[in-house]
């Protein structure tokens, strides 16, 4: 008999929830007050009362051969000999006492009452909802005595809708599993190493372990990871598969692999989650007073979900069309669908970022498999997720807007002033420097930042009197919330940085991505981190907190080495010599494209270096811009997809055109890489270098060389995409001949000079 666990709160909130989309308060003080209110009330209860009493009720769903185990903890329980009493404690912060209990709060108490009646055979039970202050003072108390039959009837009103959803999902699961059992690999033959990779992924899921895999570009990594994950899904080894990417452009490989698998009559709900602002059709404030889709969204989404469950194709177009049909917010609709989807393709953030990860999935269950594409990005991305800042200059600008719109007595204005004053009062070094590190922050600094975050959240809940400031509130709020979260973690994992002497920016900079990634993925149903540049594997596993029993797998290149001609030319591209190097670089590029006309991409360490060289390059070319939307990027690449013609493009190494794009055949004849890709020397990289020097013994390797050579390998990997592709890569830097850099190159590279 299969067992499914659900909490009392989850069951109740499935049916009893708000109608509108509203920002969850998220106030730090509210969360603290709620806990304190519970504890204070529990201490004030008399003799015989017990706090946080666990209670479970198994519910047999015979036709599904399923046992639904309902569980939770009663806030307070009096085990009286005649009629026991259940108390549900909630925080109340309203100006006036509540006139009646909130339906969802009352239903939670009723559910516990029903569970007691069933498990103890009681004829009746007392239930009450009590609203208290943070000190436990009662603001409202609503007692009831209910018979067992009354409890059962009310309980059924929330259980039956939930069971309807469960039955529908299980019907789909049976059809899905049958189709997955018959699923075959989407190509007639495996490429060399591809089958071994698939076995490794399947084993990682079965063992609930992590796998770190280096897979050369063009080896069919999407199929080699998705196929075994889907097989494991069909066998019940995992509940969902999340395919995570670092960039939107990298999703296409997964989508193409799924499309090919769907040709086998596959019953699979595969969902793509785009950024909220990208999906928004109205581009108004996400508030029921401003957006008709936000108003009443949750009254309409149940019907939309049920209709969506009747179709297999959950493409972005179909999800958007269903959201339009029911006047729903597309993003929130996708968030609801992700709870029952089989496969979800999304950005790293939705699984790993503590600020925006899908709590309804990753806080509620560990029965999820992660397939993490281009995983060499993870250390930097996780550092970004865990870091946060307080920008004094930005706060001053926003405070001016808030002051004009709402007045200087507004709580938000006052809270901003407190933080600005706290930043101004920091004791910075008197050596005239414009940036540096601080050993610690004053004791009251965190307090005023927490208060400002709460004031921000309150303002965002208001009917905004200042629409101009509305958007800026979010831009300032997110780094501040991240800063507050960072300050609650172990200070040993952070460095405190300051930038700008007049109006400083204070950053809590995360140093350790390994510990967080290890914790975030612990106990999941398999995690596969894969990339063409997850190399060297021992070092990358170390950076990502892998355990000794987490497997490493290096997939050999399936393509003949002679198909890629790699040539190195000694050019000094170091920062101090770049101006003089531009002429030689332009000469090398001209010689390459003149001797063998075709389609080429040239990658530079920076936009400044790119522009300097472009001025000396007497050839027609297209140049990557700093800001390019999807349409501009598509137009940029379209030149390569034309059947004929020569194309030369100048791009930035590590940008959108050096990773995640697929130009097979004669769409790309070669690449030129200028420099070895080292990150720019700045405060952040130097702090990282010092950290890795202390912890891993080689700061320059981990802070500079590894990320640099990963970008180089990705760029060169654009050339060979299929078994028949041939091409050239020109590496312009004398350091490519150094043993320390050669060790970081893929084993199949054969370099001539």
What are the roles of these predicted feature ranges?
Residues 1-82, 107:
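Metal-dependent nuclease catalytic cores that hydrolyze phosphodiester bonds in DNA/RNA
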Residues 57-153:
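Mg2+/Mn2+-dependent nuclease catalytic core
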Residues 171-214:
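Conserved pre-motif I regulatory segment
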Residues 178, 184, 237-344, 352, ...:
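A substrate-engagement module of RecA-like helicase motors
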Residues 206-228:
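Walker A/P-loop
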Residues 252, 326-343, 347-451, 532-546, ...:
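Signature of the SF2 helicase/ATPase Hel1-core->accessory helical subdomain module
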Residues 319-339, 344, 355-361, 455-565, ...:
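A contiguous, basic/glycine-rich beta-loop/short-helix subdomain that forms a polymer-engagement track
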Residues 570-580, 626-737:
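Conserved RecA-like P-loop NTPase helicase motor core
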